[in-house]
């Protein structure tokens, strides 16, 4: 039951409506004339220009093997009409979830801009070539970190983690190129449904949903 300590939380409120004050247009179905990919790319670019930290960050929701929801933040690294791609350790908890239930949802939350995008659909692993192409663009430190971490597995201390990093750093010291770890790669989320959300006054937000070729406005 909510108590006195929750009153501060209950008073927390953001009044949306900056789109009215600065003269920007309302989100509407015609914003999707060029497709959902074009608008999502634009909103990511808008977030970057606005100084949003990690504008391509998205909250990934999965279902655990025992049927419980789980979420975490990952980064969108590719985007086209087939869907969106992120990369991770194939032995991680999220990978276990996706092996059991190959379906996921993501949310791009740009709170500073009063915008969100929700996307959901079936998930599949990308090809080894797609993984290789992205891996080659990662900083060497990130590559070594992927080798050092047995993602989602317990470890005694941070010192132990840094020792694992030191070991792989020494292992690949004479290698010009760090190879892709055998248990690392990408996932593609095919977009069954995409929803664009824009905050508005009095909680009468703009919601536009794309399902296949159908684009429609939803009540908030």
Swiss-Prot record:
EC number: 1.4.3.5
Binding locations of FMN: 72-77, 87-88, 94, 116, 151-152, 197, 207
GO terms assigned for molecular function: FMN binding; pyridoxamine phosphate oxidase activity
Protein name: Pyridoxine/pyridoxamine 5'-phosphate oxidase
Pfam families the record matches: PNP_phzG_C (PF10590), PNPOx_N (PF01243)
Cofactor requirement: FMN
GO BP annotations listed: pyridoxine biosynthetic process
Family assignment from sequence similarity: Belongs to the pyridoxamine 5'-phosphate oxidase family.
Pathway(s) this gene product operates in, as recorded in its UniProt entry: Cofactor metabolism; pyridoxal 5'-phosphate salvage; pyridoxal 5'-phosphate from pyridoxamine 5'-phosphate: step 1/1; Cofactor metabolism; pyridoxal 5'-phosphate salvage; pyridoxal 5'-phosphate from pyridoxine 5'-phosphate: step 1/1
Quaternary structure and interacting proteins, as annotated: Homodimer.
Cofactor binding: number and manner: Binds 1 FMN per subunit.
């Amino acid at each position: 039951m909510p108590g006195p300590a929750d009153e501060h939380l209950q008073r927390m409120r953001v009044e949306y409506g900056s789109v009215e004050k600065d003269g920007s247009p309302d989100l509407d179905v015609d914003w999707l004339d060029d497709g959902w990919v074009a608008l999502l790319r634009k909103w990511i670019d808008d977030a970057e220009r606005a100084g949003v930290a990690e504008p391509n960050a998205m909250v990934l929701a999965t279902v655990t093997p025992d049927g419980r929801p789980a979420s975490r933040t990952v980064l969108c690294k590719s985007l086209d009409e087939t869907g969106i791609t992120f990369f991770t350790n194939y032995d991680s908890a999220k990978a276990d979830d996706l092996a059991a239930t190959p379906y996921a949802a993501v949310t791009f939350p740009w709170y500073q801009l009063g915008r969100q995008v929700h996307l959901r659909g079936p998930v599949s692993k990308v090809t080894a070539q797609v993984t290789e192409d992205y891996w080659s663009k990662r900083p060497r430190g990130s590559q070594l970190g992927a080798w050092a971490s047995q993602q989602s597995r317990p470890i005694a201390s941070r010192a132990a983690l840094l020792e694992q990093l030191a070991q792989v750093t020494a292992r690949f010291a004479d290698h010009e190129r760090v190879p892709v770890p055998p248990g690392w790669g990408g996932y593609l989320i095919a977009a069954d449904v995409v929803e664009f959300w824009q905050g508005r006054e009095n909680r009468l937000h703009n919601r536009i949903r794309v399902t296949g070729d159908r684009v429609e406005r939803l009540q908030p």
